[in-house]
Swiss-Prot record:
Keyword field contains Transmembrane: yes
Organism from which the protein derives: Wigglesworthia glossinidia brevipalpis
Record keywords, A-Z: Cell inner membrane, Cell membrane, Lipid biosynthesis, Lipid metabolism, Membrane, Phospholipid biosynthesis, Phospholipid metabolism, Transferase, Transmembrane, Transmembrane helix
GO terms for cellular component: plasma membrane
Lineage: Bacteria, Pseudomonadati, Pseudomonadota, Gammaproteobacteria, Enterobacterales
Key word Cell membrane present: yes
Protein name: CDP-diacylglycerol--glycerol-3-phosphate 3-phosphatidyltransferase
């Protein structure tokens, strides 16, 4: 297998995960800033690898598999770190909604692929919006530099969790007949 640029970017996103976690826990005053920077770098490579794969016509089966895996790993770890840091019901609930949604949708996509209908669950506009706001939420709550940034992060977290739930309902609506046929 030859690695192309988009796949290398996706692999880079996976490679930086341990550094993301380590930097988050470093006992330095600006460790939160650096962990937020690593997270946003991962988010940018997510956008950029998809853009390049389409632009350069370098989509591969391996890349199509690995990209969502890398996305889920960095987002779920970011949410877990935020839950751990804030120790708050108000942060935990929307974060868990998003984590559970990711697991459910990944399972639904896998099942739809098994029955030959994976093309029905293409990424929706609401999911793209959810992802953008989710990235802002995680970045802000990792950085937590000022009260305003934390408020922006919390508001973004709630908006993205609502969008996550709504997009999950949309995916279930699309798959409904297949899920409940005899």
């Amino acid at each position: 297998m030859r690695l192309n640029i988009p796949t290398c970017l996706t692999l880079f996103r996976l490679i930086i995960v341990p550094f993301f976690i380590i930097v988050f826990y470093l006992p330095f005053s600006n460790a939160s800033f650096y962990s937020a920077i690593i997270f946003i770098l991962a988010a940018l490579t997510d956008w950029f690898d998809g853009f390049l794969a389409r632009k350069l016509n370098q989509t591969t089966c391996f890349g199509a598999f690995l990209d969502p895996v890398a996305d889920k790993i960095i987002v779920v770890i970011g949410l877990i770190l935020i839950i751990e840091y804030f120790h708050s019901f108000w942060i935990t609930i929307p974060s868990l909604i998003m984590i559970i949604r990711e697991i459910i949708i990944s399972s639904l996509r896998e099942w739809m692929a098994e029955i030959g209908k994976n093309n029905l669950l293409s990424v929706s506009l609401i999911s793209k919006l959810k992802t953008s706001i989710q990235m802002l939420a995680i970045f802000s709550l990792l950085w937590k530099e000022t009260y305003i940034i934390i408020i922006i992060g919390i508001l973004s977290l709630y908006v993205s969790s609502i969008l996550a739930f709504l997009s999950m309902l949309k995916y279930f609506y699309i798959a409904w007949r297949d899920l409940f046929r005899n």
